[in-house]
Design a protein with these regions (language model features):
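Internal, well-folded beta-alpha domain core
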Residues: 93-273
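Near-N-terminal "mature-domain entry" segment
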Residues: 1-127, 131, 142, 212
Length: 273
């Protein structure tokens, strides 16, 4: 099984490290598109324009500055650069997920690089999927034209735990894979509602719990067995101090896709303890 993640908006600036080497990144067939996007980012030098295009605030000044010279920036592993809710939860659940065998089964999608492995060395940057660059147009559309064919080489017919957000799903619909899209709901007073922000934390915890098991999960039955074992152990504490756990899991029937793959929805039904 593979695990697909979105990037995080929050990032840790790399300290001292090597500069960006596109030829060293995973999925080398994406190199030309990466170069085009990096060049397009470098052309946006007006500060006000950059804040508008990259949907940035003052706290993103370092990221916007890095965008103008990405090839010369210091780099660190992608798993260390991204530091949002999902990544923090995954690391807390299973720190070993980012190294060794666990990392081999994780792919991080990116507006700047298309797709990455956790060990790929990348710089500080800011470019979300869905951004419209003046010289290239919508980044999602650009990646959609190349990501599918590039990733099919490695992931055709593979089982994928899909934790991506909508923009990153649109960049690669992957009709050749068997996607399990993760949804999180809250049960309260007998009614269920969709969890939005805290869903990132649940997806991170679930990914961490399964990361080291990926090599042994070959089909839907294997995944259901693994879920039955790991989900009862997951716990999330919110800002109020309330702790939630997974009451039940639901798996929708598989829907066949046009290129031999399928999609399902995996729903974690959570409840406060």
């Amino acid at each position: 099984m593979e695990i697909w993640l979105p990037p995080s908006e929050g990032k840790n600036p790399p300290g001292e490290g090597p500069s960006l080497s596109l030829s060293a990144l995973s999925f080398p067939s994406l190199t030309d598109t990466r170069k085009k996007i990096i060049d397009a980012c470098a052309q946006i030098t007006d500060e006000e324009q950059a804040h508008q295009i990259f949907n940035a605030s003052l706290r993103h000044s370092a990221e916007l500055e890095a965008n103008q010279a990405l090839m010369s920036q210091s780099c660190a592993p992608a798993s260390a650069v991204f530091n949002g809710v999902l990544f923090d939860a995954l690391t807390a659940q299973e720190p070993r997920a980012w190294i060794g065998e666990g990392s081999q089964h994780i792919t991080i999608f990116s507006g700047l690089f298309g797709a990455l492995k956790p060990t790929d060395l990348i710089p500080l940057h800011r470019l979300a999927m869905g951004t419209k660059l003046p010289t290239l147009g919508n980044v999602t559309s650009l990646w959609k034209s190349v990501l599918g064919s590039a990733l099919a080489e490695d992931y055709s017919e593979k089982l994928v735990l899909d934790c991506r957000s909508s923009d990153y799903k649109q960049a690669c619909l992957a009709p050749w894979a068997h996607l399990w899209e993760v949804r999180v709901e809250r049960l309260r007073n007998g009614k269920r509602s969709v969890v939005s922000h805290n869903a990132k934390k649940w997806r991170g915890m679930l990914s961490g719990a399964l990361a080291l098991r990926c090599g042994g999960i070959e089909n839907a039955s294997d995944l259901e067995d693994a879920l039955a074992e790991v989900t009862p152990k997951l716990r999330s504490r919110d800002a109020r101090g309330a702790t939630s756990h997974v009451k039940e899991i639901e798996v929708s029937p598989a829907k066949a896709t046009s290129q031999g793959g399928s999609t399902r929805t995996l729903t974690l039904v959570t409840v406060e303890a």
